[in-house]
């Protein structure tokens, strides 16, 4: 049924998605969402404010209704216009190919000849220990010095506590 066959009252009682379906059926080509809302508003005699109040629900209804298909760049059409195989081709975004110049520049930056290959068999544990120059006696001396400092600190704290207790007793 054509939109021209409906009275103004019948159009106002129809859901916006039903009107959109009729618009697509008449035009028989995809249109942008903006054009669709403009046509619906003009058919219903809607003001800008009323359209703004209902536009979110209208967009949601278009997405949910299985008869409509969102194409690229806010363009909508009827799902029945597109065979299933054609849908993937038209609705999927195109992937841009990477430039080969950038890849060549990266390869030039990485000059792998500068790095020396090291065989794990060539590395011996003895060599590593010699490089680190670990002397266990040095660590023992440091530990003893730390222990002496802690003992001195404990003695000072105990002396201070005793002095504090004596002062309290005198008062």
Curated annotation (Swiss-Prot):
Keywords: DNA-directed RNA polymerase, Nucleotidyltransferase, Transcription, Transferase. GO terms for biological process: DNA-templated transcription; regulation of DNA-templated transcription. Pfam families: HARE-HTH. InterPro entries: Asxl_HARE-HTH, RNAP_delta_N_dom_sf, RpoE. GO terms for cellular component: DNA-directed RNA polymerase complex. It comes from the Bacteria. GO terms for molecular function: DNA-directed RNA polymerase activity. Residues 138-171 are annotated as: Disordered. The keyword RNA-binding does not apply. Residues 14-81 form the HTH HARE-type domain. Signal peptide: none annotated. The keyword Nucleotidyltransferase applies. RNAP is composed of a core of 2 alpha, a beta and a beta' subunits. The core is associated with a delta subunit and one of several sigma factors. Belongs to the RpoE family. Participates in both the initiation and recycling phases of transcription. In the presence of the delta subunit, RNAP displays an increased specificity of transcription, a decreased affinity for nucleic acids, and an increased efficiency of RNA synthesis because of enhanced recycling. This is Probable DNA-directed RNA polymerase subunit delta. The lineage of its organism: Bacteria, Bacillati, Bacillota, Bacilli, Bacillales.
């Amino acid at each position: 049924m054509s939109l021209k066959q409906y009275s103004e009252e019948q159009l106002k009682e129809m859901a916006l998605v039903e009107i959109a379906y009729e618009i697509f059926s008449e035009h028989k080509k995809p249109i942008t969402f903006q054009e669709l809302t403009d046509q619906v508003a003009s058919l219903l005699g809607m003001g800008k404010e009323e359209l703004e109040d209902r536009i979110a629900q209208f967009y949601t209804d278009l997405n949910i209704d299985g008869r409509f298909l969102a194409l690229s760049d806010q363009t909508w059409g009827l799902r029945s216009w597109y065979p299933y195989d054609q849908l993937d081709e038209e609705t999927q975004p195109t992937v841009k190919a990477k430039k080969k110049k950038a890849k060549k520049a990266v390869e030039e930056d990485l000059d792998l000849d500068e790095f020396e290959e090291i065989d794990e068999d060539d590395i011996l544990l003895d060599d590593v220990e010699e490089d680190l120059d670990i002397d266990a006696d040095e660590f023992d001396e440091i530990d003893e010095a730390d222990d002496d400092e802690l003992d001195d600190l404990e003695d000072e704290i105990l002396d201070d506590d005793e002095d504090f207790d004596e002062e309290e007793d005198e008062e």
